[in-house]
Amino acid sequence: MTWTLTFPEGMKYSTGEQVEPEDFIASVEYGLEVSPYADGYRAIESMEVDGRNVIVHLSEYQADMLYNFQSVFVGMIDKDEIEKMSADEKLWGCHPYGAYYLDEYQPGAYAILKANEGYKTNNPMLKNQGPSPIKTIKVVFSGESFTFAQGVKNGDYDVLSTVPSEYYDELKAAENIDIFEAYGAEVNYVELNMTDTLFQDINIRKAIIHAISRNNLAKYLSEFETPAHSLVLRKCLNYSEEAVDYYDTNYGYDAELSKKLLADAGWTDTNNDGFVDKDGKNFVFEFDCRDLETAKKVAQSLQIDLKAVGIDMQIKTQNWSYVNQDVVDGNFQMAYLGLGWSEPFLLVDNFCSRNVECTNPDPENYNAMVAKARKTVDYDERTEQITAIQKKLFDYCTIIPLVDINGYRCWRTEIQGIVHTPTGGFYLGDVVTDADGNFRNVK
């Protein structure tokens, strides 16, 4: 199996050197050697140059490879710089191919980007396939949300890459600001430890799941968050409503069913204290919560839902990295996790995988399903397989999708021609400017 890439003449780095097919080969080989993301293109066996083409030989089809190559963390560097520079020198001294290059950097404060005048793109979304008309960009790192929100309204800033949630309503109402959805797929979910004494019985895990009301959860969430009914979300490749329907049909809110499942397992309220008990002990467990606003709101909602069926959920809040480590170590009962990516294989590689023993009762067959889907060329067939993988995860009753995280970007309405996508794509190639390069209020 082969993949052919063409590198037309005229594409240049900011140094003025032309992009050569050999640069792609050198960049991939370097990435396979040092990159933590190398698994995203590990199927490449060999590469050869044929004129302006690179023929890539693959051991097998890898569905996530193309997505990985268009991501910002996979760049192309001049072969000479790869060979001559040390790793430290590359960090600040190399010149990856792109629309802009770094001209100045003040740590913790700002960076100045300058347009690469030798840049060419094949992006079909852009009419202008050449250098950006915006010649200089100042990217500001430090500042308070209030400063950014007022700054974009007053003209101190032209664009906010991320709208602060607490200023969303104010910026949306401002006549001089355009605001758009600009965030990839990110699902927040919990995993249950099926090796824990309380959760070894799948019907107990089902009782937990059926106790959760997403209508109640929605009351706690902001414009940036909506309840999730699947693990692969609407802005992710291979999303399917079938997965949503399956989850809602089989694992939707049903407090009475939750109570019945608990009672069938011997959990009833024998002392009328509002909590179910068994063998003299109340049903009490610990929720390992990330120290983030969304997670804390979810925890409050779940705590209320579970109390309604007689379960006492106690909340432990800590830094997200400690929550993740608790799951890896198996030191958890229910833990709040999150994954953000708009391509499904990174997701299905990680769901119920931080600690397989605690969360995945059938890893061999699960991994086989993922491997088969990754090799599937047809998109629709692959979507069916991703949906089947989600159903398998749901049926484990060790993972519960909870929140679909969203985000927004805004800019001043006087700037015309920005091309953007709901998943965060942001392109300046078609911005309207006058003869002097001004992009504000150009008619």
Regions of interest found by a model, annotated:
Residues 121-170, 312-314, 319:
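Ligand-site clamp/hinge motif
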Residues 1-36, 50-55, 198-200:
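Aromatic- and charge-enriched surface segment that lines or borders ligand/interaction sites
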Residues 106, 110, 211-244, 294-303, ...:
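Detector for C-terminal structural segments
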Residues 16-18, 146-157, 173-174, 202-203, ...:
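Short helices/loops that flank or line small-molecule/ion binding pockets
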Residues 4-6, 39-82, 101-106:
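Surface-exposed binding/hinge segments that line
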Residues 20-26, 51-55, 98-99, 131-136, ...:
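Alpha-helical secondary-structure segments
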Residues 71-136, 146, 254-256, 260, ...:
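Gly/Pro-rich hinge or "lid" segments in bacterial periplasmic/extracellular proteins
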Residues 268-341:
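Ligand/substrate-recognition segments at binding pockets and active sites
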